[in-house]
């Protein structure tokens, strides 16, 4: 990327960006919600479009001079609808959290009952956590996974739905490694007369490429982020049935947002265009393959994987048999250049600031070009540093640098 002007006008920020670039280049990024956007996406993000206010929607703006940004937003909408085959799309949400909030506010009233996945079982803050707006504004009832299988307990979902009669049921997760049965959840929604919303933020790319069943035929509303498996800019989007289009659009603007970020919407359009290409499907195929190899290799080292493995891009590792907390494992791995995040596991006994697990994912390393061989090396390194945590780890640190040197980012 060209930072010639920034290097002259603000050396402090320029230098920190260079340090972050070095960090990304020289570490192995295994945080499941992160990825590396293309140069094209970043160029759109850094364009003159950042200068334009465009409150409203294409052809219905509250500002003049929107002819060109109208074309961009229309392209983003058109491409997103083509990817997922949905009836209506809104590309203005600044984040996945705001996309979720807009859906709730579009058809529900504060205090209404909603069902969502328990955060410690793999759900998300915006699916009813009491510290989040969702849990403060609405009466959330949590469902979770079966204690033995660690898979979503659909019988429990149905039982809770019949008991609490929610106005909406939310599916989707931030740390669930298995296929979600949208058809079954839709049947439960229909049985109790609830709206069905799916937050596909983590698995949107897999759905786009055909590596996870789509929620679009079943859900009234589908929300997503654009920066995880879709490899776009940080932002959100909403898909919905046409009959809810006006309510959703009003919930975003003027409901919870003002002017859309047109430079971000342009970058979203670029990433949607990338997701429509054949090589994107090849990328997602490799993401899934890499996750499966990591699963197999980690099992060889006696790591306990929540639910026994993965069907998607991420794995949740239960570290209780390794006598180390998620917090300590995260710090230890970070010391050699492997970035993961501590994560609660189902039926967690430790604080969310400590945790019994770590979450790892393959989208970012796959974007770099890592394949099966690197996954084997990564699994070896994870095991090595945890087993030898009190030893000198300089050899492992050098190995991480060597692996990274094979696949340079942003050449």
UniProtKB/Swiss-Prot annotation:
Q: Which GO terms describe its biological process?
A: glycine biosynthetic process from serine; tetrahydrofolate interconversion
Broad class of the protein's primary localization? cytoplasm
Which pathway is recorded for this entry? One-carbon metabolism; tetrahydrofolate interconversion; Amino-acid biosynthesis; glycine biosynthesis; glycine from L-serine: step 1/1
What cellular component terms from Gene Ontology apply here?
cytosol
Q: Where is this site: Plays an important role in substrate specificity?
A: 227
User: Which InterPro entries does this entry report, sorted A to Z?
Assistant: PyrdxlP-dep_Trfase, PyrdxlP-dep_Trfase_major, PyrdxlP-dep_Trfase_small, Ser_HO-MeTrfase, Ser_HO-MeTrfase-like, Ser_HO-MeTrfase_PLP_BS, SHMT-like_dom
Which Gene3D superfamilies does UniProt cross-reference here?
A: Aspartate Aminotransferase, domain 1, Type I PLP-dependent aspartate aminotransferase-like (Major domain)
Q: What cofactor does this protein call for?
A: pyridoxal 5'-phosphate
Keyword Amino-acid biosynthesis included in the entry's annotation? yes
- Keywords linked to the UniProt accession: Amino-acid biosynthesis, Cytoplasm, One-carbon metabolism, Pyridoxal phosphate, Transferase
GO MF annotations in UniProt: glycine hydroxymethyltransferase activity; pyridoxal phosphate binding
* The protein's enzyme class: transferase
Task: Give the sites modified to N6-(pyridoxal phosphate)lysine.
Answer: 228
Q: Which Pfam families match?
A: SHMT
Residues reported to bind (6S)-5,6,7,8-tetrahydrofolate: 119, 123-125, 351-353
Protein task: Catalyzes the reversible interconversion of serine and glycine with tetrahydrofolate (THF) serving as the one-carbon carrier. This reaction serves as the major source of one-carbon groups required for the biosynthesis of purines, thymidylate, methionine, and other important biomolecules. Also exhibits THF-independent aldolase activity toward beta-hydroxyamino acids, producing glycine and aldehydes, via a retro-aldol mechanism.
Relate the assembly described in the record: Homodimer.
- What family name appears in the similarity comment? Belongs to the SHMT family.
Q: Provide the protein name.
A: Serine hydroxymethyltransferase
């Amino acid at each position: 990327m060209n930072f010639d002007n920034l290097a002259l006008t603000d050396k402090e920020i320029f230098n920190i960006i260079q340090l972050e670039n070095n960090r990304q280049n020289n570490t192995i990024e295994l945080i499941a919600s992160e990825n590396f956007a293309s140069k094209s996406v970043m160029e759109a993000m850094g364009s003159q479009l950042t200068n334009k206010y465009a409150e409203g929607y294409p052809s219905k703006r509250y500002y003049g001079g929107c002819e060109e940004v109208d074309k961009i937003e229309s392209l983003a909408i058109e491409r997103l609808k083509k990817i997922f085959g949905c009836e209506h799309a809104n590309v203005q949400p600044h984040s996945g959290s705001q996309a979720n909030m807009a859906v709730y506010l579009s058809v529900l009233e504060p205090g209404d009952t909603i069902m969502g996945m328990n955060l410690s079982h793999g759900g998300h803050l915006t699916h009813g956590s009491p510290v989040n707006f969702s849990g403060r504004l609405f009466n959330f009832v949590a469902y979770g996974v079966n204690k033995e299988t660690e898979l979503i307990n659909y019988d429990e979902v149905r039982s809770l739905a019949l008991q609490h009669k929610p106005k909406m049921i939310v599916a989707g997760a931030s740390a669930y490694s298995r296929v979600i049965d949208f058809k079954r959840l839709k049947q439960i929604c229909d049985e109790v007369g609830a709206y069905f919303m799916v937050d596909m933020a983590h698995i949107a790319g897999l759905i786009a490429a055909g590596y996870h069943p789509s929620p679009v035929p079943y859900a009234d509303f589908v929300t997503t982020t654009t920066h995880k498996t879709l490899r776009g800019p940080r932002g959100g989007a909403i898909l919905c049935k046409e009959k809810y289009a006006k309510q959703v659009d009003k919930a975003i603007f003027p409901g919870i947002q003002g002017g859309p970020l047109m430079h971000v919407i342009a970058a979203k359009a670029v990433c949607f265009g990338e997701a429509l290409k054949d090589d994107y499907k090849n990328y997602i195929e490799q993401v899934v393959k890499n996750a499966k190899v990591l699963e197999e290799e980690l099992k060889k080292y006696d790591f306990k994987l929540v639910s026994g493995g993965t069907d998607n891009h991420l794995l949740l590792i239960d570290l209780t048999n390794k006598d180390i907390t998620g917090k300590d494992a995260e710090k230890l791995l970070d010391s050699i250049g492997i970035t993961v995040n501590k994560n609660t596991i189902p039926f967690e006994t430790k604080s969310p600031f400590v945790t019994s697990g770590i979450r790892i994912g393959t989208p970012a390393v796959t974007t770099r070009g890592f394949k099966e061989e690197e996954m084997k090396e990564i699994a070896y390194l994870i095991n090595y540093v945890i087993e030898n945590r009190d030893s000198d780890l300089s050899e492992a640190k050098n190995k991480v640098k060597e692996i990274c040197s094979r696949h340079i980012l942003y050449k």
